């Protein structure tokens, strides 16, 4: 079996303290390194250039997907490994990565790796590892399936590997992400169901009191929307209830907590009632 080739793609900004640590742990496992700088004011770009001549500038437009798509567009290898500067591969997991590179079946289109070290960094996650898609086949071949009434397979072939990426963040990014959510809403963009849930989650993970108050009107409107599912209404009620408590508005507080308690309930509402 021929060993696959891998492009490392990263987007970075002001990562001079940790970029070398990440690159040193993966540089000999990949066949090309592509680094996209989104506006660093420190030595990040200079450090990146000591590892690769494939360093590109990208004007930041408050869109992580746009930046990652730009990085991916520069890749030339069979697979793309997407990494962040605050990630590290241990020696054990470097060996697993190399073994994967040598044995990966050609039909695999996405490889998931475990994201570890969550609890060590003082987050409010109740788990230490979770699978995340990290390695992607650059060019996808469409395959017909079924002997009768044949159809194209749309879902990618995903492999859950035993590789664990150690996450070593220098800071909590919740504040940055919450500000980006507000910008999207202020610009009149409709949040997808996934982003709506992530906005609520980010608030409870690392939002300040002022962030809940700024988000209150948005989530109140979403709770009243007929387009939201039961789970989405619960998420919105959690944010609205906390904001109401912070304002000392007992009527609104019990309006939103009652909506959740009347259903299945949730830990966030129980916590708010405890306050």
Language model regions located:
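Short, well-formed alpha-helical segments that are part of the catalytic scaffolds
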Residues: 9-32
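Catalytic-site signature of metal-activated, phosphate-bearing donor transferases
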Residues: 66-72, 78-83, 89-219
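Flexible helix-coil transition and linker loops at the boundaries of alpha-helical arrays
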Residues: 185-192, 222-234
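Conserved donor nucleotide-binding strand/loop of the catalytic core
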Residues: 31, 45-70, 74
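Acidic helix N-cap motif at the loop->helix transition within catalytic regions
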Residues: 17-20, 42-51, 92
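A conserved acidic beta->alpha catalytic loop
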Residues: 25, 37-47, 60, 84
């Amino acid at each position: 079996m021929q060993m696959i080739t891998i492009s490392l793609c990263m987007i970075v900004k002001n990562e001079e303290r940790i970029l070398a640590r990440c690159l040193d742990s993966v540089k000999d496992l990949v066949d090309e390194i592509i680094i996209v700088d989104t506006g660093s004011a420190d030595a990040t770009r200079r450090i990146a250039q000591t590892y690769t001549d494939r360093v590109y500038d990208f004007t930041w437009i408050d869109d992580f997907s746009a930046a990652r798509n730009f990085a991916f567009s520069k890749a030339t290898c069979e697979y793309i490994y997407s990494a962040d500067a605050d990630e590290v591969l241990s020696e054990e997991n470097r060996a697993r990565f190399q073994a994967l590179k040598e044995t990966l079946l050609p039909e695999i289109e996405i490889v998931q790796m475990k994201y570890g070290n969550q609890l060590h960094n003082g987050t409010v996650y109740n788990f230490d590892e979770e699978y995340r898609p990290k390695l992607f086949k650059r060019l996808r071949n469409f395959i017909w399936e079924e002997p009768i009434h044949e159809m194209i397979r749309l879902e990618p072939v995903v492999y859950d590997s035993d590789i664990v990426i150690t996450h070593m963040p220098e800071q909590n990014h919740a504040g940055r992400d919450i500000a980006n959510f507000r910008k999207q809403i202020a610009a009149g963009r409709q949040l997808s169901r996934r982003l709506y849930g992530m906005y609520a989650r980010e608030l409870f993970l690392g939002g300040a009191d002022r962030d809940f108050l700024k988000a209150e009107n948005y989530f109140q409107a979403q709770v009243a929307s007929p387009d939201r599912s039961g789970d989405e209404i619960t998420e919105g009620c959690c944010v609205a209830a906390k904001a109401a408590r912070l304002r000392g508005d007992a009527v609104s507080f019990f309006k939103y907590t009652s909506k959740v308690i009347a259903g299945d309930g949730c830990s966030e509402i129980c916590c708010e009632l405890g306050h």
